[in-house]
A protein has these predicted regions:
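C-terminal outer-membrane beta-barrel translocator/porin domains of Gram-negative envelope proteins
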Residues: 256, 266-269, 277-401, 417-419, ...
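Transmembrane beta-strand segments of outer-membrane beta-barrel domains in Gram-negative
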Residues: 16-25, 42, 105-107, 114-320
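Transmembrane beta-strands of outer-membrane beta-barrel pores
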Residues: 43-45, 57-59, 77-83, 93-95, ...
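Transmembrane beta-strands of outer-membrane beta-barrel proteins
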Residues: 35-37, 71-75, 101-106, 178-182, ...
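Short loop/turn motifs that connect adjacent beta-strands in outer-membrane beta-barrel proteins
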Residues: 14-15, 21-33, 61-70, 96-102, ...
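Transmembrane beta-strand segments that form the barrel wall of outer-membrane beta-barrel proteins
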Residues: 34-43, 68-81, 87, 285-295, ...
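Residues that define the transmembrane beta-barrel architecture of outer-membrane proteins
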Residues: 33-35, 47-51, 55, 69-71, ...
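Outer-membrane beta-barrel "beta-signal"
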Residues: 482, 511-525
Length: 525
């Protein structure tokens, strides 16, 4: 943290040459450009180490709008040691077009281990018990023979995803607090099954995910074991959904058989905003609603129509930004039908946003429901809620910058209120595979019952499939934030799902994972 203070403070201080002025709260009024560089360092067992850098630049102009800014630039470049990478650029401009705010963003993301936990929340069982099994490396080091069936199970819930995303949003006044919103959003997807050679790279032979002949691609000759011959190709959940017809081929592959999909949409919306400031608001309402229109004639591979509604409210409990109560209610839904088909699955896994932020992967993880897995909830309609207490326990001036530390206590929640159709539409022979890998048994089922039994996946009938009735996915946690000049905010947060503390005989025990720690930027809202 000390290094962070030195980094951001020194860079920002170099740009401060004018005499210091203060506002009514005793804050230094910032003018001109402020720079906020930050290293991006993290680790993921499937993607490897993340190394990169983030740079935020704020233009406060003559300071007349402080703590709000005139312009903002955000740049990020990150690489992962196993091949994933992220490049992102955002620009938010309030004065280029008179009386119109223009926000644009471009990003390119290669994720070779993107989370995929199925559809409809608890309707897709999460096999946490199998996820927790592994070989005892210490025992193996002392001479014990590894069990080739206790391989790392994480890749079962992963896909290979590359996305190019670009957007341009415009927001203008209708009245003092009411705004219109218009935007164009474009995505190019390359989503397919995992790259097994990459996932198994540099793993011990007994940890490699069963991939048929590919299981041996990165195994040294001296480590080859005959036991590996017994490990047949293990389909991932994504591959099973394809086999069963839950995900249609036309949602993944184009007419040339390539896993390339296009998403071209127009967004129209309204926003009501009475916040006292944008970066860390302490009072006011911020509400918005928009529709997403993505017809084929606009360039989309699959037509769909969605909407998003969000209401945020901020209440000062102790004035002067000391203690704030904030909450958020959000809903993502689907409307209309396109020749009777559902919305394409790849369009459902976002919390959609207009303005100076980009869409967030959801529902699950940092920007939506802290503490549960990324994209744990994917459905046609989904609700989201957040309640926070924000306590700024210290603020000070350093290098002519306004600095503060804040604690956050929060609870998040989300729920799939309308799920995708999970009816079995694949080859009858693949149903046995479903029972083998999801239910853990290989019982033969007469073909005349297979489709009827399979439909129980989204109604939770006992005994046929491991599935649960959907209910709220709730979490709680704490966070610490370093704040510089209101807008540059570095967050450290840890979230835990309530399901982790259910009784072990509860069918919902550990269905949202075991919790997660995050290092990120800003407040969620």
């Amino acid at each position: 943290m000390a290094a962070l203070l030195l980094c951001v403070g020194a860079v920002a201080a170099k740009k401060e040459k004018k005499p210091v002025q203060y506002n009514e709260k005793g804050e230094i009024i910032k003018t001109g450009l402020n720079f906020g560089p930050l290293p991006a360092v993290a680790y993921d067992a499937d993607k490897g180490f993340q190394l990169g850098a983030i740079l935020q630049i704020y233009n406060y102009g003559d300071g007349s709008k402080y703590p709000n800014y005139f312009n903002r630039w955000y740049m990020e470049a990150s690489w992962f040691t196993k091949g994933s990478m992220l490049f992102q650029f955002q620009h938010d401009n309030k004065n280029l077009i008179p009386n119109v705010r223009w926000s644009t963003s471009v990003s390119y993301n290669i994720d070779k281990a993107f989370d995929f936990y199925g559809f409809n929340g608890y309707g897709a069982y999460y096999d946490f018990e199998r996820m927790g099994l592994s070989n005892d490396k210490k025992a193996i080091k002392n001479g014990a023979e590894p069990d080739p069936l206790l391989y790392r199970y994480n890749p079962f819930y992963r896909i290979n995803k590359t996305t190019l995303y670009a957007k341009s949003d415009f927001i203008g006044h209708i009245t003092e607090d009411l705004y219109w919103e218009v935007g164009y959003h474009f995505r190019w997807y390359n989503q397919d099954k995992i790259d097994r050679v990459s996932i198994n790279k540099k793993k011990n032979w007994y940890d490699t995910f069963p991939s048929g002949p590919d299981s041996f691609a990165n195994v040294k000759q001296e480590d080859m074991r005959t036991e590996l011959d017994d490990r047949a190709y293990m389909p991932t959940l994504f591959e099973q959904y394809m086999d069963w017809g839950i995900i249609k081929s036309g949602e993944v592959y184009n007419k040339n058989g390539k896993p390339h999909m296009f998403d071209s949409s127009i967004r129209l919306g309204l926003m009501y905003d009475t916040r006292d400031k944008e970066g860390a608001p302490t009072r006011g309402i911020w509400a918005e609603g928009h529709v997403i229109l993505a017809p084929k004639w606009l360039g989309s591979s699959n037509s769909y129509y969605r909407y998003g509604l969000t209401f945020r409210n901020y209440w000062p409990i102790v004035d002067n930004d000391v203690l704030t109560f904030a909450y958020r209610l959000s809903y993502e839904g689907t409307f209309g039908k396109v020749k009777g088909q559902q919305n394409p699955y790849y369009a459902l896994s976002y919390n959609t946003i207009m303005g100076n932020e980009s869409d967030k992967d959801g529902f699950g993880s940092y920007r939506t429901t802290r503490g549960i897995q990324r994209t744990r909830l994917v459905g046609l309609d989904m609700g989201l809620w957040t309640v926070e207490f924000r306590y700024k326990f210290v603020d000070f001036k350093l290098w002519k910058q306004n600095m503060a530390f804040s604690l956050t206590a929060f609870t998040d929640g989300s729920m799939a209120t309308r799920g995708r159709d999970m009816s079995f539409r694949g080859e009858a022979g693949s149903f046995a595979g479903y029972k083998a890998y999801i239910e853990g048994r290989y019982a033969e089922v007469p073909s005349k019952y297979q489709e009827r039994y399979y439909k129980t996946i989204d109604c939770g009938s006992y005994g046929e499939v491991r599935s649960l009735k959907e209910m709220p996915h709730s979490t709680f946690g704490l966070g610490l934030r370093f704040i510089m000049n209101t807008n540059f905010i570095v967050a450290f947060e840890y979230g835990l799902p309530f399901s982790r503390f259910y009784k072990k005989d509860s069918p919902y025990y550990m269905q949202d994972g075991g919790g997660a720690f995050y290092i990120n930027l800003g407040y969620l809202f």
